From Swiss-Prot:
One of its GO terms (molecular function) is structural constituent of ribosome. It holds the Pfam family Ribosomal_S21. Keywords: Ribonucleoprotein, Ribosomal protein. This is Small ribosomal subunit protein bS21. PROSITE patterns: RIBOSOMAL_S21. The keyword Ribosomal protein applies.
């Protein structure tokens, strides 16, 4: 969990920007989106295979 303490003489916008940056660095939001709904193991394998195929084609060209 990301934690941001508002510094002295720091605006709320700046603190929010720091918080968003820390959340994106740790990958918290992506992890949440990935786990938001249950995904069957067969669907996980299919997505993994498709991602590998895309990576392979990307390297080829």
């Amino acid at each position: 969990m990301s934690k941001t303490v508002v510094r002295k003489n720091e605006s709320l916008d700046d603190a929010l920007r720091r918080f968003k940056r820390s959340v994106s660095k740790t990958g918290t939001l992506q992890e949440y989106r990935k786990r938001e709904f249950y995904e069957k193991p067969s669907v996980k394998r299919k997505k993994k295979s498709e991602a590998a195929r895309k990576r392979k084609n990307k390297r080829r060209f």
